[in-house]
Amino acid sequence: LVGSEMCIRDRKNMQEWLADQLVSVEVVERLESKIDGTNKFVFRLQDGNVIESVFMPYKHGNSVCISSQAGCRMGCRFCASTLMGLARNLTASEMLDQIYAITRIMGQRVSNVVVMGTGEPLDNYDNLCRFIRMLTDENGLHISQRNITVSSCGLVPQIYDLADEGFAITFALSL
């Protein structure tokens, strides 16, 4: 430490150490496509629930698709997430931890985030909004809101609430 401020090297070491200590997801399976470099991650949460995330490399930057719930209660016929029912909502930190874990494993920066993995994001509204604020914070990953997409099966009251938040995100409606 130099005076009351940490030197840059100490700050970087501290951030890496904290990231290793605080991640609440454990990789239980990783599948890599030999065709395009896509990686599917199966994570176990601290309570034993399992979720999935996907890393997708593109020329314009890397995208990650994350889960917002362990399971889902929406019952969409086109989606496998509903088969196990809803176990629980993920916290904002658990959503963020999927990105931190993938970034650390892949050794590459994530520039785009899609909330379209396991679960219905708008059914976990408060944690979704908290996650977006944390993700875009300049002291965190500082990902632009314009690089975030939220996909929903269409919970109308929450769609209006999300619009009122003033986020500059992309909203996708799954039909």
Where would I find each of the regions flagged by the language model?
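Long amphipathic N-terminal alpha/beta scaffold segment
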Residues: 14-59
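Short, small-residue-biased leader/transition segments that mark boundaries at the very start
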Residues: 1-7
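Short gly/ser-rich anion-binding loops that grip negatively charged ligand groups
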Residues: 8, 28-31, 62-65
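Conserved Radical SAM active-site core
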Residues: 53-169
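Extended basic (Lys/Arg/His-rich) segments that typically form rRNA-contacting surfaces
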Residues: 9-13
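A broad, low-specificity signal for short, low-complexity segments enriched in glycine/proline
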Residues: 4, 14-15, 131-135
